[in-house]
Amino acid sequence: MRDFVHLHIHSEFSLLDGANRIKELPVRAKELGMDAMAITDHGVMFGAIDFYKACKANGIKPIIGCEVYVAPRTRHDKDPELDSKYNHLILLAKNNDGYKNLSKLVSLSFTEGFYYKPRIDKEILEQYHENLICCSACLAGEINQAILKNDMDEARRVASWFKGVFGKDYYLEIQNNGVKEQVLVNQKLVQLSRELDI
C-alpha cells in the first residue's frame, strides 16, 4: 500500500466535518504502510504545525494543504442573492514557497473574502498559484457542480481554466465515498481527463 497517499483529509479543525485527530492520523498511516499524507481542512490551516510535527515523529512525510472556498464572483462581492454559495478546491503545498502562497491565500480569504466562510477568488489564485498542486475537490467543487447540472460545456471551461493556471499541477479528483452522485461525477471526470489531457 506504500504507493497510496491520502491527499484529502479533514482533521478536528474542519468543524462539523472532520472526526480525525491530528496526532492519530500519522500513527494510522504508518500502521497501513503509507509514507506520506496530506491535511486539507476546510478553509483553515490551524492544524498544520501539529500535523507536521506528528508526521515527522512517525516517519511520515507531511503534505500541507487546505480545502479552500472559492467565491462565485470575487472575494469582495457580498450580495446574499449571489455570493452566499461557494465552491470547494483542494490546494497542496509542493515546498516552502508553496506553503507561503497557501498561507497567503488562506489569510486573504479571512481578511478580504470572508462572507459566511473564508473565501478566495480566481484573481488571487492566479497571483499565488506557484508551487501549489490543485485538485478539483469533492461534489462541492466547481467542475463537479457543473457535471451534476449536466453542463459539460461549463465543466470543460472550468477544467481548462484551472489547467491553464496550474498546468501539470492540476488534477481531477476521483472519490469512492459511497455517494450515488459521485459515481456519475467520477465517470464524467474520467471522460474530461481524457478529453483535456488532465
Where are the regions a protein language model picked out?
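Phosphodiester-processing cores and adjacent nucleic acid-binding clamps
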Residues: 1-198
